[in-house]
Amino acid sequence: MAQHTAAAAGGDEEVAEAEAAAAAAAGSTLRHRHAGKGAEEHEAAGGGGGGRNGGADDPDATSVERVFADKAVPSWREQLTLRAFVVSALLAVMFSVIVMKLNLTTGIIPSLNVSAGLLGFFFVRLWTSAVERIGLLKQPFTRQENTVIQTCVVSAYGIAFSGGFGSYLFGMSETIAKQATEAKDAQNIKDPHLGWMIGFLFLVSFIGLFALVPLRKIMIVDYKLTYPSGTATAYLINGFHTPEGAKLAKKQVKTLGKYFLFSFFWGFFQWFYTAGDDCGFKNFPTLGLEAYNNRFFFDFSPTYVGVGMICPYIVNVSVLLGGILSWGVMWPLIAKKKGSWYPADISDNSLHGLQAYRVFISIALILGDGLYNFLKVLIRTIAGFISMVQNNSKGMLPVSDNGMSMSTAEEVSFDDERRTEIFLKDQIPKSVAYGGYVVVAALSIGTLPEIFPQLKWYYILVAYIVAPVLAFCNAYGSGLTDWSLASTYGKLAIFVFGAWAGLSHGGVLVGLAACGVMMSIVSTASDLMQDFKTGYLTLASPRSMFISQVIGTGMGCVIAPCVFWLFYKAFSNIGTSGTEYPAPYAIVYRNMAILGVDGFNSLPENCLTLCYIFFAAAIAINLIRDLAPHKVSRFIPLPMAMAIPFYIGSYFAIDMFLGSVILFVWEKLNKAKADAFGPAVASGLICGDGIWTLPQSILALAKVKPPICMKFLSRAANAKVDSFLAG
């Protein structure tokens, strides 16, 4: 912690530079670090359009495009450069490794847009500087090319998440099936293999790109949907390409590199002490052995300290509260009912025992939270359409950047006029969109049953008929709130298609595969609209954005399965509860699929009652959050975040809370530097520890074992060991 607080206590000159650069980047460059999927939607939506429309008395002072007025906008072909895609591929591998590690440990994926943007800017600047010195630079680095890189990288590493390697895809495996209550037959199991995973992702990941392309003008120009994450990314990129922003970006990259090296070498140092099970700093009983047995300890993970610095305070506090409620109160109390509520002769890790309460109560919280937010966004979407119908008759557009109606007769700003002109210049033919959707759908309908024989062609046909409607709802809702409900639509598919198939016809596998189909379409369509918003605000061509998204998706369909395969082969205990890589959402998704086809027959006593209580509590807490004044609601925890430690424990919650404390203290000491450099520090901690996983995996594959086991024993256990060794 001393390192972080010391970094915050820099000189006044650096603070002034940071403040000036932040102001030059339209005030919102780094303020939106929380505006990612799964982040606090109210914070994201509230700041999404800020900084751009203020100061109406002096348009030149607040106009972003007047700053770049003397720079020609490159054609869409010039925006697609070889160096952009080389850098994108390198960063895609890096971030796919990081996301995969997060997937397989806790399933919490923070927004990595800031680090992706910083590193993309840095590497191409490095490239162009080197080429310029030898006099071979033909094309300068523009913000449009920067946007292409950002789009390509995010779409590539996004496959590591939406591909289901920590959820539905891995949930099909025998490893996870053995830990479930039933459906362990061959009909409901499919183990991972590199070939079919790559094929599956190519079949399902592209169709979402075609679903909403014809509606881009309506969503971005006519409705003026905010898309806070896309807006924040655009401000970040615009800021980099001003003189002040470039200067700040260099300092941020230097800071990121410093903490990257610290985190990487800390991971390397820890490796030497992990020669056996439960060895090393990751198993340090910092709060005592009894707390350690209940999964309360600090595991010295730079990754989750960094995640805690990126996630909103309320998320981190919610996760910690969930850990205290479950592992500190509920599970010890339920454990005392052993022999009464569930058989005394089975392990606590059996889904016929205590583990059932851990898994199914967390599922109840997740489903309650998901259902509430699904209905909330659906209501807002319907309300938006009603507003559109009413206002169209009055010559009004339904939504402006501040969420208010805007007259078509209202004076259009220089920025909006310039952006709309460029955005409508390079059209994507509707024949490409419609034809692409039909062709990819036909290929999927014909080929997916070869990968999953249980997944009949008519299941896929129904999914592809319904998917564009759901994709539009999700993209519209995401534009309003920054809240993507792709995983909720995926869970809905689990129940609908799993129940349709039935347990005896591989319903569990059908539900999980259908979840992947639906999630991929809905998530990709929403992400594409976010990227179109970024392109709109940086004058990047929609055509170059679409091509970049296609190339990035193709990269991800190869890179993500290869990275997962590396983990799967290098670490033998992936997916096992209580290990370094428990893949918690894999067991959660599989048990959802079992519930969808078989109901609640196998749950232990009172488990279903507790599930009902927590399902209702999740809805009630969300309702109170929305009805209460902001000064009260910002202290009410998030049920979805509380559910995460119910199954895997609180060790990562302590890491994340420590990250929050570090950032909070830093902001109190020096808010300007914390705002400017906090995301860079966090990204360095996450990236360094994540990238260390690559050499660690290679060492494991080469059968190179660490030399030392550092383990902690109680006094009594130590005495027994000493006695045994003494003979």
UniProtKB/Swiss-Prot annotation:
- InterPro entries, per the entry: OPT, YSL-like
* Chain intervals with Low complexity compositional bias: 1-10, 18-27
Which keywords annotate this record? Membrane, Transmembrane, Transmembrane helix, Transport
Tissue expression from the record? Expressed in leaves and at low levels in roots.
Annotated transmembrane regions: 84-104, 107-127, 152-172, 194-214, 256-276, 314-334, 359-379, 432-452, 460-480, 492-512, 546-566, 604-624, 646-666, 681-701
Region feature (Disordered): 1-61
Ranges of Gly residues composition bias in the record: 45-54
GO-annotated molecular function: oligopeptide transmembrane transporter activity
The domain of life is Eukaryota
NCBIfam families linked to this entry: OPT_sfam (TIGR00728)
Name-wise, this protein is Probable metal-nicotianamine transporter YSL14
The encoding gene: YSL14
